[in-house]
Amino acid sequence: AHLDLAWHQYIPNDVGHDEYLQWAEKIGTQPMYTINLGTGTLLDAIHIAEYTNHSGGTYWSDLRRQYGREQPYGVKTWYLGNEMDGPWQIASWEKDPKGYGVLANETSKAMKWVDGSIETAVCGSSSPFMGHFPQWDLEVLQECYNAVDYVSLHHYHTAAPGNYFQLLGGAAYIEDYIETEAALCDFVQAKMRSPRKLMLSFDEYGAMMRPLQGIEHPGWGPYNLYHSHYRFDPNAAYVRHDPDNMVDNRRREVGDMVPALGSASILLAFLRHADRVKIGCMTSGLGALCATDREHVWRTASYYPFHQLMEYGRGQSLQVAVEGDTFDLPAYAVNDTSQYPAKEGLPYVDAAAAYDEKAGALTLFAINRDPAGDTQIQLDVSAFEGYRFVEHLELCAPDMDARNTWEAPDTIAPAVGQSAKEEQGVVTATLKPLSWNVLRFEK
């Protein structure tokens, strides 16, 4: 066991390296492994890569075999630390982006010498609201651009309780973050005369509603971060990490539809930027897609947009031109650090599309962000000759406090919409207030 300084708890190491990787194999998922570049060293990274991915004949690979794992695990994607710019990190690189970039460069290079098939991700700023963004990222990338494959991004969009425009308009801020980071990468690519184009890994994201603190200390200074993470409380007690208590501590102040639409709006932003966002990880994972009362497990509303995007969001991402009524978002502040600028002209309909030519499938995904009324749409697909309209799937809640339970698991579930009509390559449909919609076409 050891102290987890960040979360002020004891970590008993009940699940170790081998246990985790073997579990990942059993459930059929690919692990994304983060190495320690705070208190850890380059040599530690070499050793863990050798233990994990080298076939045998060396100290570390033979130690793995001695522990009962003959074949290497073949972990493909490795992260060079986590949120290394954050003052909440142990041995943060906040004040030395060049130093972190040099270490990331040398570590990635060495790990790829151990196994040339792996890919690595370097940390960007852990939020677009960090005071040093994007300069910190630029200084990091200038030191490691040719050694890494991804830049890791994190952001949790926050809106005031009950403000659905703030919640669902959050996709615009996510896209600003993506486009800024991609532009930084492309600038460094040009500066380095490099043939390599870096991709983005948005490996922590979420959307939530919580009370806004507002701005207590005007300006973009680091006060709020230091106030939060430089607290030294002599009375704070360490507790044992206990997953069995996590269910009781889960926050579910709102119904199922709010987090479902919030996460879906971010996923649409990812789909629109599929040329650069190659990895996306919902932080809450199973905790968002399902719920439990300890005795039972059931699907939340968030499961359905995620599942439908995974099923139908295949092939090529298409840019969707949306013309119609819009709304404006006034600027607002969550706290001193997270200050959202004003946005103008955001369409009520948030949309993205996928075209799988090989499978003969065309799919439009759309959110009606208007909480007050239906939105009528006309979808022109006449350029896709030979494609026929298949169905309109819609997801909406009887009220925003509704949620699925074990006793009523289908309170919020997809239904086939009855309003859609096709005529000469144009589909008309009605999108209900605060609804998720999938319109499918096949050839």
Give the label of every model feature segment.
Residues 48-52, 94-97, 135-141, 167-169, ...:
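Short secondary-structure boundary/capping segments
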Residues 163, 200-350, 359:
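Aromatic/acidic polysaccharide-binding cleft in carbohydrate-active enzymes
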Residues 385-427, 431:
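Acidic, Ser/Thr/Pro-rich beta/coil linker or hinge segments at domain junctions
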Residues 146, 150-158, 167, 171-188, ...:
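Extended catalytic-interface subdomain
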Residues 39-43, 81, 85-89, 127-132, ...:
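Flexible loop/turn segments at secondary-structure boundaries
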Residues 24, 48, 78, 151, ...:
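Conserved, mostly hydrophobic/aromatic
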Residues 1-158, 162, 179, 186:
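N-terminal catalytic cores of secreted or lumenal carbohydrate-active enzymes
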Residues 344-386, 392-395, 434-440:
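Carbohydrate-binding surface patches
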